[in-house]
Amino acid sequence: MFANAQTFHPAVKIEFEKVVYVRQQMKELASDWFDIIKDRLPEKAVSYYEFIGDTLHSIYRQTKEAVIPQNMWYQGTGEGNVVYNDYALGQTITKKPVAEETFLINDSLTKIRWKLTNDTRTIAGYDCKKAIGFIDDTLAVFAFYTDEILITGGPESIHGLPGMVLGLGVPRLHASWFATKVETNGVPLAGIKPETKGRKSTRGAMMATLDNILKNWGKYGSAMRLNYVL
C-alpha cells in the first residue's frame, strides 16, 4: 500500500498566509453604515501563522500581524488565537481573545461535518483534495488537504480530514488561509505546548459570554458571532 513510504510525512512545520478581505467582510457585517466607513477600510489584511505538529498533537499561532496603513481602520478577530490540539485524546486547549478578555478554552476538538469531493488543487507543491465542512451547522468551510502529510490538522481549529489541510476558505468570513512553505525535516516538536494563561472556560461557556455581549448589537452582533466559531 505504501510502496513509496518516504513521501508520507508524520511531522511538519507550515507557514500560512491568512487574507481577510476587509471591505467585503465589513459590507456584510455593517451594511447600514458601510458607505460611511468604506474609504477608511483597507481592501484586505494579510497576516502570517505557523503550524507545527505530528500525528499526536500540534500548535498553531500567529507569527506576524497584518500591517494596516495609519489612515486606515481594521480590528481583526481571531488574530491572537493560539490553538493546541491533542489528536490522541481528542482535546483542544485554545487561547482566544474575545472583546476585552482572553479565554483559555479546554474542550473536545471542534465537531466538523465533512463532505469529500473529487476536486483537486496544488498548494505549496502538494496535490490536495477538496472537502466541504460544516461547523455547528452554522459555518461552511472549504478545505484542501493532502494525504502525503499524515496529520489530520489544519489552520485554526480545523481537523478531521484524512490528511493535512494546506488551504482553507471561509466565505462567510471573507477569509482564506494558504500554506506558503512546508518543512518536513527537523521539525521542532519540542515547542508544541499549550498556552496556560487566560480565563479558563469551555467552548460553550465562551460562546454564551459572547452572546451576552452581542445580544443588543442586532444584525451586526449575529454576524460578528461567526468570527468566533472557527
Label each residue range with its predicted role.
Residues T7-L230:
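Extended soluble regions of mature proteins
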Residues F2-A5:
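Sec/Tat signal peptide C-region and signal peptidase I cleavage site
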